[in-house]
Amino acid sequence: MQTDIEIAQSVEIKPITKIATTAGLQANEIEPYGYDKAKINLDPSIVRKQELGKLILVTSINPTPAGEGKSTVTVGLADALNLADKKTMIALREPSLGPVMGLKGGATGGGFAQVVPMADINLHFTGDFHALTSAHDTLAALLDNSIHQGNPLNIDPRRILWKRVVDINDRELRHVTVGLGGPTSGVPREDGFDITVASELMAILTLSTDLMDMKERIKRIVVGYTYSKEPVTVADLGVAGALTVLLKDAIKPNLVQTLAHTPAIIHGGPFANIAQGTNSILATKTALKLADYVVTEAGFGADLGGEKFLDVKVPLLGKTPDTIVIVATVRALKHHGGVALSNLNNEDVTALRNGLENLGQHLTAMNRYGVPVLVAINRFTSDTEAELQVIKDYVQQFGATAYTTEVWAKGGAGAQELAAAVIKKSAQEADFTPLYQADDSAIDKLNTIVQTIYGGTGVELSTKAQKQLQDFKKYGWDKLPIIMAKTQYSFTDDAKKLGAPKDFKIYIREFVPKLGAGFLVALTGSIMTMPGLPKHPAALDIDIDENGTITGLF
């Protein structure tokens, strides 16, 4: 059996100029990065239609550590819609190098449902993440320099919020000490590193509507507090212009293609467990103005990326999804039903039935928004007909229909039934209802998310988190949207509690204000903003030969 990268290398890629033409872009509206990649210029003339296209949101159940093929289904569905003569584009996130070299691998789909050039996209791509890392760490250096150069802003080194970042999973960097070496080396203080995708600049990039909006958002970033506990912003430091210059190209969406030559815009890459988990506003809106159907995804499960897409991105995008597709796998549902990861290839209808509660809670949560919901079963070779039928029967009680997809093996041809259902559902009038109101308090928003999306009873705040909310109210931050930083494997804040637990509370240990992005991050349980590497990192299997042929990427 061919690997993902072998399949990607075996298919002829069209010149990116031809893909741009297919998408409806003129030659002067793109900046080619070689033969097969391009940046799309931020030009209002790109508007081709008065009405936006249909928006299809692909999300999933709580995944296993290997993922459930959400990106694969997203790509396969878009290819299937094009096979049905619907002008379709994809809007995806950029992969982070950390997971590519770590456990999960890349984020370009799989099999015959991939975006290409697969290796480039999963590695350095067009340099967006490098630009973000440079801008973020430039701000960190400028902040420390201000303290070293007489500290005119009276910044308290003990209350600095702005860590450094690197796009690698490196647990050794979570807690570091900087400024050692005497007076010429700065002011000693405790610091740490986050992974680049956790940077507020990444969130800002994906939520900005244009270059100047990004600049204004950067000004609002809170980097720390003074000795009198007043917030210090980038505007106070006076460096928003320099940071925006570093990101002037990164804000431009990237154009690539699928193996079936469907145009794909890949831009931005915040994780959904520690940030909002969506691609950029600019990428999605550009696709909506060019295509009749746009298939996009949100990171991890519907409890994380799905909820954040609907409650954080949609108000800024100005467009609600026309259909939501929840990706499920027999393997993951059996895992939620108690089967060990090593035994998931064996038929176990009883465990599958037990695990279906996880899918049921996701269906209940997504139905709450008033958008038509479908289920896509991403089929594996070990799945039996009996197991597939159990899922199809179960979802009917939630008003949904489940469709088996085989896009890994067949590409768009493996999702034609799903595509037909998406076309039919998207023709209906959706009655979108937000989960909470903008002026709800932070605690009300938190409780609503836990009760409605997770199926729990509410939240429990640490003493620190309670004090922070009091301070936020004083600063006028207490009604910002909420980003829950939570494990992706469970509805709870404990990764080991699978299925659909009841009667639980989510423990909020602290908040991180992200004024530039425009939300509050609630850190739950033991969630980390700098991941670590597994015992067997994917990097151990990646290699390159004398001809430059890469192996081991997935």
From Swiss-Prot:
Q: Which reaction does it catalyse?
A: (6S)-5,6,7,8-tetrahydrofolate + formate + ATP = (6R)-10-formyltetrahydrofolate + ADP + phosphate
**SUPFAM superfamilies attached to this UniProt entry:** P-loop containing nucleoside triphosphate hydrolases
Q: Which residues form a coiled coil?
A: none
Q: Please name the Pfam families in this protein's record.
A: FTHFS
Keywords annotated in UniProt: ATP-binding, Ligase, Nucleotide-binding, One-carbon metabolism
Q: Which PROSITE patterns match?
A: FTHFS_1, FTHFS_2
Q: What is its EC number?
A: 6.3.4.3
Which top-rank group of organisms is this from? Bacteria
**What is the top EC class of this enzyme, as a single word?**
ligase
Q: Where does ATP bind?
A: 64-71
Q: Give the GO biological process terms.
A: tetrahydrofolate interconversion
Q: What is the protein's given name?
A: Formate--tetrahydrofolate ligase
State which gene encodes it.
fhs
